[in-house]
Amino acid sequence: MYLKALEIQGFKSFPDKTVLNFGEDITAIVGPNGSGKSNVSDAIRWVMGEQSSKSLRGAKMEDVIFGGTEKRSQMGFAQVTLVLDNTEHIFPRMEESEVAVTRRYYRSGESEYYINKQSVRLRDVNELFMDTGMGREGYSIVGQGKIDEILSVKSADRREIFEEAAGISKFRHRKEETERKLLTTEDNLLRIGAVSYTHLRAH
């Protein structure tokens, strides 16, 4: 698996649709300060499901949308599409040789997510990448200062980092979700039991 292409439109410093094509070999994005290199990595993190505006170097999520300049009007939405090679079926749920993930965000706060042009939920995007160790909580993309942060975190947090990188965090998430459902079911059964007991006493 490798990153084949990145399509950016209306995201931060990219008002026009911009397509970056990548090969299987090492790719370096170079340029002077302020040319948008960091915005490219932000775009990748964002389309993979990042929900923290702080992690994207902004105060609020709306800040990812191109804010306009003296010569250009602001955009009404931001959209990023990530195209990944899947010939080795790293994404076990996907049969296609390519997987394209799209995220669109409007100034109204509405979000849209797509996998191969099919409308999906954020949860579906998270689970897709969870199967690969590339999730938004993972460290396939490491920003400036992130190495020091990893080294200084508590052992429990470091364990989560390794679980995500190893691609096994999905099992922990699914276990936690199952446990929540069991607790909800137990609460419902207790309520039913209480209602039944009250009904029997009334008769």
Where do the PLM segments sit?
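Gly/Lys-enriched N-terminal cap/neck module of very large, oligomeric protein machines
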Residues: Y2-R201
